[in-house]
Amino acid sequence: MGANIGDTAIYFSLKDARHVYAFEPYPYSHNIAIKNIKLNHLENKITLLNEGCGKRGFVTIKEDYENTGGTDLKNFKEGKKIRIESLDEIVKRFNLTHAALKVDCEGCEYDLILNASDEALHAFDQIIMEYHYGYKNLVKRLEQAGFKVKYSLPRYSHNAEAEYSNMYVGLIYAENRVLCIN
């Protein structure tokens, strides 16, 4: 989640991931990701979607908005209508099981994780995410779902492009401890 220019999707593909589903809502970054995936001949291992993740709905994004990372999802008055999917919808759509989830979506992690069902979260053996506005609710939700969670303490970051420019950023690593029988 938060494919940006495709570098992480390419990394996981080169590290023998079965298949990578990469979501990037910004058309500008999405187009660069397409080029990078083609340059690495990974079109058959990476499904790149010009969609976002979080709370289900739509946003409008200017197609020429040059977001190359570090900004939250903006809703423009004019532009391309971009679909936003919940984690439950994504898990069901791609029939995900025993997957890994990487989340770096500049704030969408809260809607994505806090509103996900236990069933959707249990589709993932490992979750690594960057958080932007605190970790406590995310850690609590993952622990309630049966994950063993480690996290880095937040560091202050000022991002003038973000809706809330004063952020406390860090990483969360979660490992699923729930036994799945399927």
List each language-model region with its residue ranges.
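Phosphate/nucleotide-binding beta-alpha loop and adjacent structural elements of enzyme active sites
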Residues: M1-N182
